[in-house]
């Protein structure tokens, strides 16, 4: 297993996103859910998978003691470890790496952790801690106080696909956030020409590159639903140069043969939506190709005026092979979602 310092975070992200096309498969914004846990006396296990960065308020106390934005168990655990089981928000995934963040847990942080996983075909989520199907995918490693631990599996993506994750904390303590990155296994199509959102993260889409994401992550473009406020969209900083544009390149969940329509949604962006947008597509010839959307771009949606807080629907109805799309916003601003409906 390889660990990365914060100075090497760019390399870590390159391995996760560019090389392995992985996303955080347990996060709550994708529908990840805490199924069960051994203990959460001081702070809720559900905090682990929240998309926001952890915060600290040293003046705040609750019935159990000092308030912490994370998962914290009680002292003096008589068992070997505490644990939490999380159901992925995607159908299944192959795991490559992750992050354990002990932010603000200092003197009460988790000394060691390990990660196990299993695959379950049922939908009821009735998974128990001592299920015989659990396999270790990240070996036990040491955690320090109030710091981020970035790691990648030494032997690459797991060969097996998984649906559930078990985080083990030895022997007890606190963890602020838990991210686990994997390549999504899309659900099987009912028929070959079954129309789906090819730019939906749960169908395997990944945001590969972007010009800027100052106020909101480009990954948010691919999330389910229309969100709840501006925080869960993609937003760039204000531009001051004439002719400026911002852009995002997205690898579709599968290569298209037909595109029915494209939707660009500016939900909740009312005074900061882009003035215009364009959408282009290109075809990456093979998985081994170094091309990540830098080929010949073909116009799918020409320069179009946008408005605040609405879905902009562009009828395409064209047979076209596309593996990547490029959303360009002119000159800058915020977009909530992009949908590429086709097969």
UniProtKB/Swiss-Prot annotation:
It comes from the Eukaryota. It catalyses: allantoate + H2O = (S)-ureidoglycolate + urea. Pfam families: Allantoicase. Its EC number is 3.5.3.4. Keywords: Hydrolase, Purine metabolism. Disulfide bonds: none annotated. GO terms for biological process: allantoin catabolic process; purine nucleobase metabolic process. Induction: Repressed by nitrogen. Pathway: Nitrogen metabolism; (S)-allantoin degradation; (S)-ureidoglycolate from allantoate (aminidohydrolase route): step 1/1. One of its GO terms (molecular function) is allantoicase activity. InterPro entries: Allantoicase, Allantoicase_dom, Galactose-bd-like_sf. HAMAP family: Allantoicase. PANTHER family: ALLANTOICASE, INACTIVE ALLANTOICASE-RELATED. Utilization of purines as secondary nitrogen sources, when primary sources are limiting. Belongs to the allantoicase family. This is Allantoicase. It comes from Saccharomyces cerevisiae (strain ATCC 204508 / S288c) (Baker's yeast). The gene is DAL2.
